Amino acid sequence: MLDLKMIRNHVEDVKAKLATRGVKPEAIDDLLAKDNERRELIVKSENLKKLRNEVSDQISQLKRNKEDANDKIQEMRKVSQDIKGLDEQLENIAEEVESKAAHLPNLPHEDVPVSLTEEGSVEQRRNGTPRTFDFTPKAHWEIGEELGILDFERAAKVAGSRFVYYVGDGARLERAVYNFFLDQNNAAGFTEEITPYMVNDASMFGTGQFPKFKETHAGYEVKDEGLTLIPTAEVPLVNYYRDEIIDEEKLPISVTALSPAFRSEAGSAGRDTRGLIRMHQFNKVEMVKIAKPEQSWNELEKLTTHAETLLQKLGLPYRVITLTTGDMSFTAAKTYDLEVWIPAQDKYREISSCSNCTDFQARRAHIRFRDENGKLQYVHTLNGSGLAVGRTVAAILENYQNEDGTVNVPEALVPYMQGTTVIGKK
């Protein structure tokens, strides 16, 4: 949530920055008009409450003097009714103001490339050289199906499209990957959590998924329960601190969690219809940092660097790009995408997004800290995948495949596979 006071004081700057994210200036004008109406009602209500107090004092004085107070009593009743009516209007308008403000995305950082589409993202660096094959590399779903370690057909029978069964060494590889990620994250100072996989509406609002997810049907809601299956562990990890004041000395906080992620993939018809790239349910290891404002940009670089080390230790070629203003998530002020090389597609595909959300989520979730001067401030929140597990499995199957259909296990994962170095058909 953007600070209304900041919007009022920097209207044209806010309009210009949000225009790079596709927000029309009328949206800001509508918000401020409604906010002005709310503020005018507050003044009227406060004036009437002041008048009510004055009339009440006059009634008391008349009664002490044993004089007739009926006219003043009638006046006070009318004032009280007017106050009640104004307060009801105020409540309705306050909801409208919050709703309009809740639909505005975060302001982009000044060095984010400006574009309303993904075109224009800036590549920062690459690591590793994509392998040159002396045979035509197969897609990961072909490899998995031929080895009997991925079963999309039975998953479709049981649940529908965009689901998968991991079988045998496929399940072991998936487990090896996420245990490796969690161990690396723990070693880097992240505190591991096991979170709820369903959250309430306030939590989804706090991290910025609602109201957009409700309107676009991007998630899975549990009917009549007020719960939603999490699209990422970012939601419960950040909301752990919702409505709390954190001790300053505890900042920055780094937490991590493995969880399933549930996505309806609304609007993705025809895209990545095969394989592990775009699923309705997939495992993901998430990383979240909560920091003081002056720490957050350095923490974003550290978060991104750590995500890179995971790919480096797995020997997977990747690149890092800075997303454009129009391609970032709703809550982000700046995002680095890590894209891993997928040989069968002959291109890099996203495997992690590392974002600084500044105080945007903290305002929605009311997460604050008290600074050294005793002043309450909003924290900054950051998040990043560390990493998407299914996409990592896909990248391993494709980058480590052999001509005979077998797959070599990355050296870092061999201990997690109980010494298995090659996955073959059984």
UniProtKB/Swiss-Prot annotation:
Q: Does the keyword Nucleotide-binding apply?
A: yes
Query: Which positions bind L-serine?
Result: T232, A233, E234, E286, S385
- Residues recorded as binding ATP, renumbered to this chain, are R263, S264, E265, E350, I351, S352, S353
Residues spanning the membrane: none
Source superkingdom = Bacteria
Q: What class of enzyme is it?
A: ligase
Known Pfam families for this protein? Seryl_tRNA_N, tRNA-synt_2b
Keyword Aminoacyl-tRNA synthetase attached: yes
What Enzyme Commission number(s) does the record list for this chain? Answer: 6.1.1.11
Q: Which reaction does it catalyse?
A: tRNA(Ser) + L-serine + ATP = L-seryl-tRNA(Ser) + AMP + diphosphate + H(+); tRNA(Sec) + L-serine + ATP = L-seryl-tRNA(Sec) + AMP + diphosphate + H(+)
List the molecular function annotations (GO) for this entry. Answer: ATP binding; catalytic activity, acting on a protein; serine-tRNA ligase activity; transferase activity
Q: In which pathway does it act?
A: Aminoacyl-tRNA biosynthesis; selenocysteinyl-tRNA(Sec) biosynthesis; L-seryl-tRNA(Sec) from L-serine and tRNA(Sec): step 1/1
Protein family: Belongs to the class-II aminoacyl-tRNA synthetase family. Type-1 seryl-tRNA synthetase subfamily.
Assembly description: Homodimer. The tRNA molecule binds across the dimer.
Protein's name in the database: Serine--tRNA ligase
Q: Per the UniProt entry, what species is this protein from, by scientific name?
A: Pediococcus pentosaceus (strain ATCC 25745 / CCUG 21536 / LMG 10740 / 183-1w)
Gene for this chain: serS
